[in-house]
Each structure stands twice: as C-alpha cells, then as structure tokens.
Curated annotation (Swiss-Prot):
Coiled coil feature spans: none
Binding site for Mg(2+): 103, 227
Keyword match Transferase: yes
Name of the protein this chain belongs to: Bifunctional protein GlmU
Listed GO biological process terms: cell morphogenesis; cell wall organization; lipid A biosynthetic process; peptidoglycan biosynthetic process; regulation of cell shape; UDP-N-acetylglucosamine biosynthetic process
One term of GO molecular function: magnesium ion binding
Residues where acetyl-CoA binds: 385-386, 422, 439
Cofactor note (record): Binds 1 Mg(2+) ion per subunit.
Length: 457
C-alpha cells in the first residue's frame, strides 16, 4: 500500500508577531514543521509534500535537508484550498495520503502509524484525528453515528444544543484515500461567510458519496496547534517533559526536570547526572557517567564519558573522557580537548587542540593552538594569536610547562619537554629540553622614594 503525506505550512501566523513564517519557530531546538516531517518519516512515510506560501524561501531554507517536495499556495484561501494547491503532488498516485499541519509539532510517530493502520484496516475513505477536551468551546465537534463512524463535523457556531454538549473535537489532521480526496476536491466550494475552501467540507462531501469516515482519538497535547508565543511556550513545556522523561527512562538523573532544558536531538548516556539550570542544545552527545553541574550550556558538542562540567559554556567542540571543565570556562567552536584534561576557572579556549592529561587550571586564553599531552599552563597565560590582520597558530609539544603570566606571541613553537619562566613573553621557538626566560632584569633603585619625597614617615 502506497502512503504519502501533505503538511500544510503556508499560514502567515499573524499572532506570532514575527518576521519569520510561523512553522519555522522552534520547539526544543527544532522548527515546528521539522518536528512534523521527522515524525512522519519515523512512521515510514517517505513521500512528503509541504504546502508553502508566505515566507516560502525561508521555509525551504529550514527544510532543505529533509528531502521533501513543495507546493505553492500564493493566496491563503483556506485549508481545502491548500490541499487543492497540492493536487499536482497527488496526480497519478493511488493509495493513502495523510494531511498534517506544520504548526502542530507535538504529533507523535506512534499516532501517525496508528492513523494509517486504522484507516487502511477499516477500509475507510477518510479518517480524522480527534481529541476529547473538557472545554470544547470554539472547536468543531465530531458527531458520530451509532456505529461509531463519523457522521459530520459541526463548527461551534453552527452547533445545536445537543451538539454543544459533545466534547470530541476536530484536529484538522486527516487521512484520505487519494482517489476519494481528489474527487471530493472537485466538488469543494467557498460558499461561506469567509469565502474560503474548508477541508472539513471534504469530510461532508465524502460522507454524502456513501463512503465510510472514521476517527481516532488521541490526547489533546498531540493536536495542539501553535498560533501565538504563549502557545509556543506551552508546546515547549510539553515537549521538554517528553524529552526529559525519555532520558530518565534511559538512565539519566535529573535533579530538577522543571529547570533543565534539553533539545530534542540531544543524546545522553546512562548514569549521567544533570543539575538545575543546564541547557543542552542542538546535536549534542553526552556519553555515560557525566556530571553537569548547574548553569552549564552545551551546544552541538560531543562530551566523552565521565566528564564533569561546572558552570561553563561548550560550543561545537569535543571533550574527551574523564576531563573536568570549569567553573566558568568558555570552550569555543572547533576545540578538541583530550582525555583526563583539566580546564579550570575563567579559561577560554578557541579553535584549539588540547592533548590528554594537560592542565589549564585558571585565567588563561588559548586560541588557534595545538597543545600536546601532559602540559601545564600557569595562571594568566595568554596565547596572543591575532597580529592585527590575521589569526596565527601556536604549537606546543608534550610535557611543556608554561609559567604564570606568560605571553606566547603567535606564530610560535614550543617543543617537547620545555619550561617557560613566569612572566615571559615568548616570540621565538623554544627548543626541546630548554628553559626559556624572556623578561626584563629586575632593577632595585634604593632610596628612590626618599629622593622623590614620597616616603611616608
């Protein structure tokens, strides 16, 4: 059986008050429309078409790696009109098409699979997703036959007294036999107060043709649409709870779930402990047995097993197993830190490689450098990597000892097994086995304060 999906992503999203199309706003680090696409794909639906409109180039840019096709809706004339715009996508296809909305990011792949299975096994011409809510005010009601089949969808304003008591509501997400849908679209009109073409009318047309219409009921959170920043925040809360629950089931400890923020694509190994206030973003991988203390942010990075991070920021970098980072360290993009290293307080590292067992304990800047293993950086060391025009490279070998308050003027090379005296400014290569001293000789001028009249008596 051929299955495909159409995702409606052309809405303007006026209530978002944003220059961006609504569907590219993110929930837990991923665009809403990409949440829907990815869950459709997890349900083994490979052929996906997006109906796009306002801000189409932006939507294309955010979905370019999702292998989808596009249909253009120049004017937003209703959900039915959006599907009419995708008729070319459905042309010559036989099978089943599901229709989802790009602003409902909480739909799960399990529900999508259930929708197709229910639709196909029941031999329905159309199947819709519904939900039951305590307060259905404003929603279209699902009115069922005694057999359980869907009889009709009635908009709230058109409900009679009995229909107003119904608390099963329409989600705006459907499954259709493709041939039935295309035939029904031919009979769709905009004879209503808004002058729009409604997809709900397709259900009525299908029913009048004598075809079966069914519905599956899912939790409300799965069909919750996002039309404002308030609803975006509500969707974020639901998604964050799902994400944190998944990690806890897989053996991760959260000291406080409510104040821990993890993006949807993050992977975390078991026996990792995460303290309040941590933010883990993008395609980050945290391996097993790590401890992330409060107020740490990690983005698009790989953190090896047994790493301890405290009050620090790690961006687009790799930290080897058994390393400690922080407090208050800043690991900038393209940094690779080896195993069992120590990156201490107020240390900034940028676009550098740090070898195994190297210690950079405090108040140090390392940029555009290659640092070997078992090195020690004293407090206040600075790799001076910018010459005023371009960034230059520094190379430091294994077992180098860099004394406190040292400046390494790039480009420069410090070879294996070297010592640099505290307070030095190194501008030339330091040979292996050498002690480098590059500082002015101390001069004591005795009686100078007395001569200047500055001596306090």
């Amino acid at each position: 059986m051929y299955n495909c999906a159409i995702i409606l992503a052309a809405g303007k999203g006026k209530r978002m008050k944003s220059s961006m199309p609504k569907v590219v706003h993110k929930v837990c680090g991923k665009e809403m429309v990409n949440h829907v696409i990815d869950n459709v794909r997890k349900a083994n639906i490979k052929d996906v078409n997006l109906v796009i409109g306002k801000g189409s180039e932006t939507v294309k840019e955010h979905t370019k790696d999702r292998n989808v096709t596009y249909s253009m809706q120049e004017e937003q004339l209703g959900t039915g009109h959006a599907v009419i715009c995708a008729e070319e996508f459905l042309k010559d296809k036989k099978g089943t098409v599901a229709i989802f909305t790009g602003d409902a990011p909480l739909i799960t792949n399990e529900t999508i699979q259930q929708l197709f299975e229910f639709h196909n096994s029941g031999k329905y011409a159309a199947t819709l997703i519904s939900s039951t809510v305590q307060d259905p005010t404003g929603y279209g009601r699902i009115i069922r036959e005694a057999s359980g089949e869907v009889k009709k969808i009635v908009e709230h304003k058109d409900c009679n007294e009995e229909e107003l008591k119904v608390n099963e509501i329409n989600s705006g997400m459907y499954c259709f036999d493709i041939e039935v849908l295309l035939n029904s679209l031919k009979n769709l009109n905009n004879d209503n107060s808004q002058g729009e073409y409604y997809l709900t009318d397709v259900i009525e047309i299908t029913k009048k043709s004598g075809d079966k219409v069914g519905a599956i009921v899912v939790p409300y959170e799965e069909i919750m649409g996002v039309n404002s920043r308030v609803q975006l925040s509500e969707a974020e809360i639901v998604m964050r709870k799902r994400i944190n629950h998944k990690h806890m089931v897989n053996g991760v400890t959260f000291i406080d779930c409510e104040s821990t923020y993890i993006d949807v694509d993050v992977e975390i190994g078991n026996d990792t402990i995460i303290y309040p206030g941590c933010v883990i973003q993008g395609n980050t991988t945290i391996k097993e047995g790590c401890t992330l203390y409060s107020n740490s942010r990690i983005c698009n990075s790989v953190i090896g097993s047994g790493v301890i991070v405290e009050n620090s920021v790690i961006l687009e970098s790799h930290v080897g197993e058994g390393t400690t980072v922080g407090p208050f360290a800043y690991i900038r993009p393209e940094t690779k830190i080896g195993k069992s290293a120590r990156i201490g307080d107020f240390v900034e590292i940028k676009k550098s490689t740090i070898g195994d067992n190297t210690k950079v304990s405090h108040l140090t800047y390392i940029g555009d450098a290659e640092v070997g293993s078992k090195c020690n950086f004293g407090c206040g060391t600075v790799v001076v990597n910018y010459d005023g025009q371009r960034k230059q490279k520094t190379i430091i070998g294994n077992n180098a000892f860099i004394g406190c308050n040292t400046n390494l003027i790039s480009p420069v090379k410090v070879n294996d097994n070297t010592y640099i005296a505290a307070g030095s400014t190194i501008t030339n290569e330091v040979p292996e086995g050498s002690l480098a001293i590059a500082r002015s000789k101390q001069i004591n001028k005795e009686g100078w304060l007395d001569k200047k009249g500055l001596l306090k008596k």
